[in-house]
């Protein structure tokens, strides 16, 4: 873009204009670019592995954000350079998020990657209370105390093309600032200069040595209490209160390693469609979620329910036998079909009449430690609605709550001992162009005050076996704790 085009866009009324440059980056990786450009508070790295086995084409590296929104309950704080510049008590924090995003009138420049910045971060599980007032405030203690919503204004991002070995660096420029075009171009050149510098070496992760033992964890439940909670849910199901509930346990350990080393280990042990590393300054969120919560791209709304789990086998033959066993398990199939129906209902709430389709039904996807049954539901976003409307309709996922959803969440409030926080919420972005991509916050660690917390659960139906449900939660956290052990082992050397 030249200066004349920049000024033309400013005259039209855009208050943010993307400036971009493209460069070969075949000697770099998304991780090395993050460490060179963005390894500071309020930054992020987003990567993807499709179907558990193939790296996605694009990775996104968010440079440190100067403006951040933090929401606790109904109180909203906007911080700029770490200083609170706005403070609001609001009736609907989700409406505030949308109105805040609308302050940014960003020009859509042809040829740029489909994601070139936006509001990036998470919406916690308890954001459902902004929509479903019947649930009230969380009745459970909140030992983590992290925000219910945390979003960074991502106005400088690098999009790495893993296939072509090149990258786009994109910065948003406010045309009202003095010498805005020249300052934006200078910032891009500064980023390129930084990329040319060698990276400070980090200690390698030793994958050939003896495998570190998984750390012992402290649970929010005893095993007996968790199995009793499963039994109580089965009583509710038999009484006709609900068809399924998804309880969870939080597992916590002391953690002294560098959070980025945990991400490095996790992307090795458990590559998934949604991999993320967030440095929020006072805490980190590190995850490898297999499951989209809701995606809106060019007005197509997509959810992808995952339900039905088996551990991975030691051989291909064992994997196939486990797949056959999973697909012939009446309990797992019934649970999955229930969640397909819930997904259709959720997508239908914001889609044009007759547009909702089941585009994939009960396929198996394999991950490092487990395999899942997966389906795909899509619909055309109804005219007049936005990506935020889709989030309102679908958060939290049925796979993290149950069916019917509201009654299941009331039972979760009754039986779980702590507020869920990030777990079970949405991690991802609202792009400037109106698109949205969010993952369910599962297989996710919150690192806070020298402790690491990971939460896992499972869907309970009428014929669930309490002992097996406990074991399922242990299997689901195994990749994370294996990564924790390697990160700790590396830091101790």
Swiss-Prot record:
Pfam families tied to this protein: Anth_synt_I_N, Chorismate_bind
GO MF entries: anthranilate synthase activity; metal ion binding
CC cofactor note: Binds 1 Mg(2+) ion per subunit.
Pathway in which the depicted protein is active: Amino-acid biosynthesis; L-tryptophan biosynthesis; L-tryptophan from chorismate: step 1/5
Needed cofactors: Mg(2+)
Protein name from the UniProt record: Anthranilate synthase component 1
Gene3D superfamilies in UniProt: Anthranilate synthase
Reaction equation(s) it catalyzes: chorismate + L-glutamine = anthranilate + pyruvate + L-glutamate + H(+)
Disruption phenotype: Cells lacking this gene are unable to grow.
Family: Belongs to the anthranilate synthase component I family.
Regulation: Feedback inhibited by tryptophan.
Species this chain originates from: Pseudomonas putida (Arthrobacter siderocapsulatus)
Keywords: Amino-acid biosynthesis, Aromatic amino acid biosynthesis, Lyase, Magnesium, Metal-binding, Tryptophan biosynthesis
Class of this enzyme: lyase
Quaternary structure and partners: Heterotetramer consisting of two non-identical subunits: a beta subunit (TrpG) and a large alpha subunit (TrpE).
Binding site for L-tryptophan: 48, 273-275
EC numbers: 4.1.3.27
Ligand binding (Mg(2+)): 335, 472
InterPro entries assigned to the protein according to its UniProt record, in alphabetical order: ADC_synthase (IPR005801), Anth_synth_I-like (IPR019999), Anth_synth_I_N (IPR006805), Anth_synth_I_PabB (IPR005256), Chorismate_C (IPR015890)
Disulphide linkage map: none
Function: Part of a heterotetrameric complex that catalyzes the two-step biosynthesis of anthranilate, an intermediate in the biosynthesis of L-tryptophan. In the first step, the glutamine-binding beta subunit (TrpG) of anthranilate synthase (AS) provides the glutamine amidotransferase activity which generates ammonia as a substrate that, along with chorismate, is used in the second step, catalyzed by the large alpha subunit of AS (TrpE) to produce anthranilate. In the absence of TrpG, TrpE can synthesize anthranilate directly from chorismate and high concentrations of ammonia.
Residues reported to bind chorismate: 308-309, 423, 443, 457-459
